[in-house]
Amino acid sequence: MGVVEGLLALALVLSACVMCNGGSSSPFIRKVEKTVDMPLDSDVFAVPPGYNAPQQVHITQGDLVGKAVIVSWVTVDEPGSSEVHYWSENSDKKKIAEGKLVTYRFFNYSSGFIHHTTIRNLEYKTKYYYEVGLGNTTRQFWFVTPPEIGPDVPYTFGLIGDLGQSFDSNKTLSHYELNPRKGQTVLFVGDLSYADNYPNHDNIRWDSWGRFTERSVAYQPWIWTAGNHENHFAPEIGETVPFKPYTHRYHVPYKASQSTSPFWYSIKRASAHIIVLASYSAYGKYTPQYKWLEKELPKVNRTETPWLIVLMHSPWYNSYNYHYMEGETMRVMYEPWFVQYKVDVVFAGHVHAYERSERVSNVAYNIVNGLCAPVNDKSAPVYITIGDGGTLEGLATNMTEPQPKYSAFREASFGHAIFDITNRTHAHYSWHRNQDGVAVEADSLWSFNRYWHPVDDSTAHVSH
């Protein structure tokens, strides 16, 4: 072989290496520390003072379009009232919303009285105050309704997943609260309390988690996704109803989007249409979830809500050795639809680390052509794993090597993310690791809308 031929051969080898390898694995080295849950006597778990004082107060969107709010809370001494008194910032006239309460038992645990009350017919872009605990110890909170739905309405979402109640969880929530971009609503991608990690699935840890997160979720909606740690299927202790604690404590407006289950549903908020899917409910052809999504995606009006966001728990594209390819069967079922309907971004959790993909799809395979590898696809979403909230299970640190081409950026650190919609064409995305200052973006990109501005926004094309 001559010199020229040798150089050409070397160039081909190097080119092949570039094509096979992916983006960047962060050089940041997190100090290895054991992740430990906060003890039950921690300040963040404090029970509010007063007889029968409401605790674990949380809100979520209560309808399809953002003009209703579900307010939930727990009383422990007696049922008390399920009424919510509320009024707008510009009015002293209090209105009353009536609710209902539920209780449940789990092994040797009996819940408090869990109240759920929906406030309806709210005005857009308005600050409301609300009171719960009427007749006993009353507590007051507030929230701000979203702007009216429209294609160029700016709005800022926070992203948190796999939070738990460790010291790292507290850092994540504090970091999110202090972020100068000021998320207005949290999109939560599953795995809330991790109570199932305790002996007999100790549901006291559901109560402590509710008190821990109240400082945020009582003031802004968290949009809920169910994860595997919400399952609580424990036949060994006589508990055979999956998701019992979760469905009693966290209500969502699933019926507003014609869903038959609280595990999959959709909402519209500002300029976004958000679809929540269930990784742990049946999703094969002919199942209720499949039939619902098949009807839901064509309903998305991109001239009204240009940003199409999907939430799920188990990621489809994951280059960590943890939970590797667990989402594969769901991906095979639904990915062609995601490409067809030009989903902008998919957020998942489950893997306790951070990763962002390029816009890729793997839908060309059939039994004849044998093509079975992700390829760049401008009609495909970006897939982001944000399961780095701080769970006591610790970080996922083992990654597949070499880094796959579909993986743009990955790092084993705890943190949160912000998805900041500017208008119908542009949104700024940023990931913030807990170790940095609140304004530091450890990973970021401008996302270009797939319907209105489907240009190449891959890491290779746009400076990172």
Curated annotation (Swiss-Prot):
Q: Name one Pfam family in it.
A: Metallophos
Its Enzyme Commission number?
Answer: 3.1.3.2
**Glycan attachment positions:** 108, 136, 170, 301, 398, 423
Question: What are the GO cellular component annotations?
Answer: extracellular space
Tell me which residues bind substrate. Answer: 228, 350-352
Which CDD domains does UniProt cross-reference here?
MPP_PAPs
Keywords, ordered alphabetically = Disulfide bond, Glycoprotein, Hydrolase, Iron, Metal-binding, Secreted, Signal, Zinc
Q: Which GO terms describe its molecular function?
A: acid phosphatase activity; manganese ion binding; metal ion binding
Report what the protein is called: Purple acid phosphatase
Q: Which organism is it from?
A: Glycine max
Q: State the gene name recorded for this protein.
A: PAP
